[in-house]
């Protein structure tokens, strides 16, 4: 079972970093650079996750997915969204076939 509270603690830290000096905080520097910089990090971590998977490197898959989740959480926070928003969407989709879920999307 996933420890959802660790995600909430990370989210709280990310919120605090919005107020931090960009020269003293990596996350604050990402926020200061804006959406493009954050998206670039998410894309970079997604690519690294794919490379680890293609290499069948289990340890690196976990490391890279952790980095991907982290930077995805930075992106969520940047837009005023939270882990709870994502969890709510997972709950909404639970038990729905992927094909049916995609058909239900408006765009």
UniProtKB/Swiss-Prot annotation:
Coiled coil location: none
Name this polypeptide is given: Phosphoribosyl-ATP pyrophosphatase
Pathway: Amino-acid biosynthesis; L-histidine biosynthesis; L-histidine from 5-phospho-alpha-D-ribose 1-diphosphate: step 2/9
GO BP term, pick one: L-histidine biosynthetic process
Gene: hisE
Biological source species: Azoarcus sp. (strain BH72)
InterPro entries: HisE, PRib-ATP_PPHydrolase-like
Main localization, broad class: cytoplasm
Subcellular compartments: Cytoplasm
PANTHER family the record matches: HISTIDINE BIOSYNTHESIS BIFUNCTIONAL PROTEIN, HISTIDINE BIOSYNTHESIS BIFUNCTIONAL PROTEIN HISIE
Gene Ontology CC annotations of this record: cytoplasm
Keywords (A to Z) from UniProt: Amino-acid biosynthesis, ATP-binding, Cytoplasm, Histidine biosynthesis, Hydrolase, Nucleotide-binding
Catalytic activity reported: 1-(5-phospho-beta-D-ribosyl)-ATP + H2O = 1-(5-phospho-beta-D-ribosyl)-5'-AMP + diphosphate + H(+)
Presence of keyword Nucleotide-binding: yes
Similarity comment: Belongs to the PRA-PH family.
EC number in record: 3.6.1.31
Any GO molecular function: phosphoribosyl-ATP diphosphatase activity
Keyword flag Oxidoreductase: no
Annotated transmembrane regions: none
